[in-house]
């Protein structure tokens, strides 16, 4: 009932981002801008020498993706999914924006604060690394318990 008929398609009319100080890429430039976005991200990841540099590249590219704002709706969700995708592609614990960090994340985006986005990304990736380590430990404990039975 509330499903848009243009879901999954590039925008055809200008859009705005509420609370943001930037103007999204015009529709006629979306495809070219996305091509440049991917090239720049992949180059930055190739040049990165550490996990932190990779997270920095991913978070900065997220800001660029949100500036392109290629769809009429769902750009935030797609952008955050791309953060997770590129973290996994680079074997980095994914940056998952939790509810408790939403305001900080939105403020960093709206203020175009690359440093804050990087710090948030590093912090959340580390939190996810610890969570994964705990889960692996719990699985091992359970498997040991099953073997002893």
Regions found by a protein language model. Give the residues of each.
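FIC/Doc superfamily catalytic core
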Residues: 1-149
């Amino acid at each position: 009932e509330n499903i848009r008929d243009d879901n999954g398609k590039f925008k055809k009319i200008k859009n705005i981002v509420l609370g943001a100080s930037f103007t999204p890429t015009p529709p006629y430039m979306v495809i070219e801008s996305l091509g440049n976005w991917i090239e720049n991200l992949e180059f930055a990841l190739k040049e990165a020498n550490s996990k932190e540099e990779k997270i920095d590249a991913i978070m900065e590219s997220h800001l660029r993706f949100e500036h392109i704002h290629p769809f009429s709706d769902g750009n935030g969700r797609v952008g955050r999914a791309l953060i997770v995708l590129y973290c996994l592609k680079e074997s980095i614990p994914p940056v998952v924006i939790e509810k408790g960090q939403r305001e900080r994340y939105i403020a960093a985006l709206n203020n175009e604060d690359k440093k804050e986005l990087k710090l948030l990304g590093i912090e959340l990736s580390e939190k996810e690394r610890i969570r994964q380590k705990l889960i692996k430990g719990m699985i091992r404990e359970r498997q040991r318990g099953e073997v002893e039975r």
